[in-house]
Structures are given as structure tokens and as C-alpha cells.
């Protein structure tokens, strides 16, 4: 069986116009996949050079396959049908290591056609590294590497204003473009680079903040033999992802036309402020996950897919989204409804086995950031506690017993919470404290919740009622009235 390469698998190739920091699965199934579609359907005509930003030889370089690889996009489509689509990606030209080929890295700035910089260097990537110097070959941090490359660009083209870049980071931090810009300016100042360069940074370059959303499951290790037999070639860089994707870019409208989104619309939004879209994702997608996990797991289920195929649990989650989360969010209702519909479809994806226990990681913090704002807003708007979000808090409290049907399971959270729950549940089982005492102790920790939740009218009482129902009837019976 032949391995992918451009000689044996000839096809379109594109001039290099995009620099991409990061060689991982996510960018290849998200950015490079979208660029490939735009190349096919518009005159974007943009090839990608991947820059490996870390000193590592694993995985091997994508250049071993001449930049070619296959994405397999699978999940439920808009009609709820299971679909699987294999696509040979031709948008990537090559990969270079900034550690092994530093001069080649700097030469990227000499190409007059270079226009875009994308990156995903993990959440820790957009950070300051003390000691990074201009003459390092390379500097350690991504922002320092980018600063050096931008200075090379500025110098090569004598500060021409039409030779700046549109810089679009995809790292999962708030306002990632603004954070990256601040660090580039910090290094420029620290390295005593000219005021003219700093002015060029500001006038010629656009730093965009983003929200990225797609579950990328990467290399399908357990299915490789079957998939390669279907494809008819060997691909060491197979990349699988869900059908859904969303790319929100905070930036000027010209970004849409430069990416040719006006000629072939993808699920990419160019917006003035990313904040409401982040709130939507956190509240609906992440919030539904967080509400679902303790309820579904204690009902005897193990994966998100199993939960969404369970009539009662699915109804509980959907009612939480549509009746309690969406009404308190500040975005057009049709956008929220459309996003919510996509979320429930994503949860039902038969190709993704999403373990509930893995999502349960750091559940206390997740509840505070993802559900509590909607719970409190719902009470303020209607004067009534949202029944399902409140029940989810009771279910979370029960989850931290660490036992299901007589078997223990691992709890992954801050040591403080694990120890505190262990103490409280022991006292409860020994009859030393009541259920209400236990609930009061959990809700009173204002250092965690940001306020003392025992002061929220009726919350202690309702969580206690729900928790008692879970303890006496079991999760299935306790949740039924809310389904």
C-alpha cells in the first residue's frame, strides 16, 4: 500500500501565504481543513507552512508526506443522519522545525505573499518567558518567536504598510489576540526595537481574538487498518473530527473578504466582540455537559452518547438548555436556538465515545463558571430557582460521595474539595450531620463560589430536598419529575 506523497497522488498545490505555528491534530482538522475548502471553492489560493514551535521529533514531520494527509469528518449532520466524509487535504505545503531550521523559519518573512499567521501552541503558549532574547535561535516562547519573525518582515520590506499580517491565534484563552499582541509589544520594548517598528506593528498588522469549537479526536488508532483499506493508501497523519465546527473571529470586516468567506460561506463569524459567543458556548455546550454528567453517571450511564439515547436523561438536558439556560443569555434567540440544536446533535454523535468520568474532572469549578451564572440569573429574572440547574447542583453534591451501586470511582478535583466532601459524607453516613447541614457547608464556601450561596433565597432548602430524593429514591426516580 502506497504512502501519501505528491508524486503518487498528484493534485492542486498553492503558493505559500499562511504561516501556522503548531503541527497538532486540532489545527489540521480545523484551520487547514477550512483553508482547503476555501482553496477549492474560491480564489483564496493559499498554501500553509507549518512551523513546529517546540523542540520535538514526535510526531514525525508532515513533510514526510509532502504535507498531504486525510481528514475524516464524522457525526450527525443537520438532518440527524450519521455521516462520514474523508477528504485529502492539500492546503499544507510543508512543515519546518524552528529549532532545526531557524534560518528557513526567518526566510518565511521574506516571502511577499505571506499574509496570515494562525497558531495553536496550547493554553500555555501565549505567555511571557523571562530571558527570551532577540538573538536567540530560537527564543523559547511563541510570542517571542513571532516578534522576531515580525521584525524580520518589517526589516525585509522597509516597513511597508501593505506587508503586515493578519494574526489569528486559536489558543483556548480569553481574548487570545489581545494577549498575544500585548506580549509582542512587550518583547519589542524589552529588546529595544525601534519606535518605527512598534508603529508598524500597530498600523500594518491585525491581531484577532478567536473562539474555536470542534471536537477533534485525532489519529484513529483502533480503526486505522479498516480506514486505510477504504482509502487505498497509508496515511500516518489521519485526523478525525466531529461534523460540527464554529470559528468566531473578532476583527475588522476585511478579514472575511481576505479569507474569501464572502465567496464560500463557512461556519465562520467575523464579529466586533467575541464575549457573547464565548458565554454562549460556556453556558450551553459546557453547561449542558456539566449538568448532564452527575445525573447521567449516577443513573448508571457511562458516556455522553448513552445519556443522550436515554429518554429521561436526554429530556432533562434539553429542558435545562431550552427552559433555563437560553432565556437568560444575551444573544439573538434564533442564534441561541440554532446553537443549542447543534449541541444536542453533537452529544449524540455515534463516532465519539465521550466518557462521563473524564468530563467530571474539576466539576466544582466547572459548575461555578458554567452553570451558576445562569442559575442565579434565572432566579433574579423570575424569582424562582431554575429547577434543573438546582437539581444538577444536588446531583453534583451526591456525585462527590465517590460511590455508585456499591462500587467506588475516582474523583478528580482540587484536593481541598475531595477531602472536604469525604469528611462531610462520612459525618452524614454516621448520622452526625443532616443533609441540610451538608448542603449548607458546601454552599457556604464563598472563596470558591465568589459569594456565600446560603444567602440565595431558597437554594439550601431546594438542594437539600433534591439531594434527599437522590439518596432515598436513587437518581432515576429522583430526576423523573424534571424530565
UniProtKB/Swiss-Prot annotation:
It catalyses: D-altronate + NAD(+) = keto-D-tagaturonate + NADH + H(+). Keywords: NAD, Oxidoreductase. It comes from Citrobacter koseri (strain ATCC BAA-895 / CDC 4225-83 / SGSC4696). NAD(+) binds at residues 18-29. The keyword Oxidoreductase applies. It comes from the Bacteria. This is Altronate oxidoreductase. InterPro entries: 6-PGluconate_DH-like_C_sf (IPR008927), 6PGD_dom2 (IPR013328), Altronate_OxRdtase (IPR023668), Mannitol_DH_C (IPR013118), Mannitol_DH_N (IPR013131), NAD(P)-bd_dom_sf (IPR036291). GO terms for cellular component: cytosol. Pathway: Carbohydrate metabolism; pentose and glucuronate interconversion. NCBIfam families: PRK03643.1.
Amino acid at each position: 500500500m502506497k504512502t501519501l506523497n505528491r508524486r503518487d497522488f498528484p493534485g492542486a498545490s498553492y503558493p505559500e501565504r499562511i504561516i501556522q505555528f503548531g503541527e497538532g491534530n486540532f489545527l489540521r482538522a480545523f484551520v487547514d481543513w477550512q483553508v482547503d475548502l476555501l482553496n477549492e471553492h474560491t480564489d483564496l489560493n493559499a498554501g500553509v507552512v507549518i512551523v513546529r514551535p517546540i523542540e520535538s521529533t514526535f510526531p514525525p514531520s508532515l513533510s514526510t508526506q509532502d504535507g498531504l494527509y486525510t481528514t475524516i469528518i464524522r457525526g450527525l449532520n443537520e438532518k440527524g443522519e450519521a455521516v462520514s466524509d474523508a477528504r485529502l487535504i492539500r492546503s499544507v505545503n510543508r512543515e519546518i522545525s524552528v529549532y532545526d531550521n531557524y534560518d528557513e523559519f526567518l526566510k518565511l518573512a521574506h516571502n511577499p505573499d505571506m499574509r496570515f499567521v494562525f497558531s495553536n501552541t496550547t493554553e500555555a503558549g501565549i505567555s511571557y518567558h523571562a530571558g527570551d532574547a532577540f538573538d536567540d535561535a530560537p527564543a523559547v516562547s511563541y510570542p517571542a518567536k513571532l516578534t522576531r519573525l515580525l521584525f524580520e518582515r518589517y526589516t525585509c520590506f522597509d516597513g511597508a504598510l501593505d506587508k503586515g499580517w493578519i494574526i489569528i491565534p486559536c489558543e483556548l484563552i480569553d481574548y487570545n489576540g489581545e494577549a498575544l499582541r500585548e506580549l509582542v509589544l512587550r518583547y519589542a520594548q524589552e529588546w529595544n526595537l525601534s519606535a518605527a517598528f512598534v508603529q508598524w506593528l500597530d498600523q500594518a498588522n491585525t491581531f484577532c481574538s478567536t473562539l474555536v469549537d470542534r471536537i477533534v479526536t485525532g489519529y484513529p488508532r483502533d480503526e486505522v487498518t479498516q480506514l486505510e483499506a477504504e482509502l487505498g493508501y497509508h496515511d500516518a497523519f489521519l485526523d478525525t473530527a466531529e461534523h460540527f465546527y464554529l470559528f468566531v473571529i473578532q476583527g475588522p470586516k476585511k478579514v472575511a473578504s481576505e479569507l474569501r468567506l464572502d465567496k464560500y460561506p463557512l461556519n465562520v463569524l467575523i464579529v466586533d466582540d467575541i464575549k457573547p459567543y464565548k458565554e454562549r458556548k460556556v453556558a450551553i455546550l459546557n453547561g449542558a455537559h456539566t449538568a448532564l454528567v452527575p445525573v447521567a453517571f449516577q443513573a448508571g450511564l457511562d458516556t455522553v452518547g448513552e445519556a443522550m439515547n436515554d429518554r429521561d436523561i436526554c429530556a432533562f438536558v434539553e429542558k435545562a438548555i431550552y427552559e433555563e439556560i437560553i432565556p437568560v443569555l444575551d444573544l439573538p434567540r434564533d442564534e441561541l436556538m440554532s446553537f443549542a440544536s447543534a449541541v444536542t446533535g453533537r452529544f449524540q454523535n455515534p463516532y465519539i465515545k465521550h466518557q462521563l468520568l473524564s468530563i467530571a474532572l474539576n466539576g466544582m469549578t466547572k459548575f461555578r463558571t458554567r452553570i451558576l451564572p445562569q442559575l442565579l440569573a434565572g432566579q433574579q429574572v423570575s424569582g424562582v430557582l431554575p429547577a434543573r440547574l438546582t437539581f444538577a447542583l444536588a446531583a453534583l453534591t451526591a456525585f462527590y460521595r465517590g460511590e455508585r451501586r456499591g462500587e467506588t470511582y475516582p474523583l478528580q478535583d482540587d484536593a481541598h474539595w475531595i477531602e472536604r466532601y469525604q469528611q462531610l459524607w462520612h459525618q452524614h453516613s454516621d448520622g452526625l450531620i443532616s443533609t441540610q447541614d451538608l448542603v449548607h457547608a458546601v454552599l457556604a464556601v464563598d472563596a470558591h463560589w465568589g459569594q456565600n450561596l446560603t444567602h440565595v433565597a431558597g437554594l439550601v432548602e431546594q438542594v437539600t430536598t433534591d439531594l434527599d430524593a437522590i439518596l432515598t429514591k436513587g437518581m432515576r426516580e429522583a430526576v423523573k419529575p424534571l424530565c
